[in-house]
Amino acid sequence: HSQGTFTSDYSKYLDSRRAQDFVQWLMNSKRSGGISXXHADGTFTSDMSSYLEEKAAKEFVDWLIKGRPKHADGSFTSDFNKALDIKAAQEFLDWIINTPVKE
């Protein structure tokens, strides 16, 4: 039960972090004039999709590079890694499924 609570809390943290990153991206785009001009012609959605695709790809590559940490607390680390593996796989598959094919 505590593992599920931890996983849920961690998932909420990741969602919060993504939201913070997105807000920061919006603020940076607004300062550079990217959003106000692009919103009317529909490119805002495309810009957001590109941002999210790049972010998902970067997070997945970072996850692959870091690999599995080794700790003395093997059981907790193992369970935590399994939860992260599942979450990363789900996010990667969602990204692949939801990415429009560019011609």
From Swiss-Prot:
Keyword ATP-binding: no
Name of this chain's protein: Pro-glucagon
GO molecular function: glucagon receptor binding; hormone activity
InterPro entries the record matches: Glucagon, Glucagon_GIP_secretin_VIP
Phylogenetic lineage: Eukaryota, Metazoa, Chordata, Craniata, Vertebrata
Other facts noted in the record for this chain: X's in the sequence were included by homology with other species sequences.
Pfam families: Hormone_2
Annotated keywords: Hormone, Secreted
Keyword Ligase recorded: no
Biological source species: Aquarana catesbeiana (American bullfrog)
Main location class: secreted
Induction per the UniProt record: Produced in the A cells of the islets of Langerhans in response to a drop in blood sugar concentration.
GO cellular component, one term: extracellular space
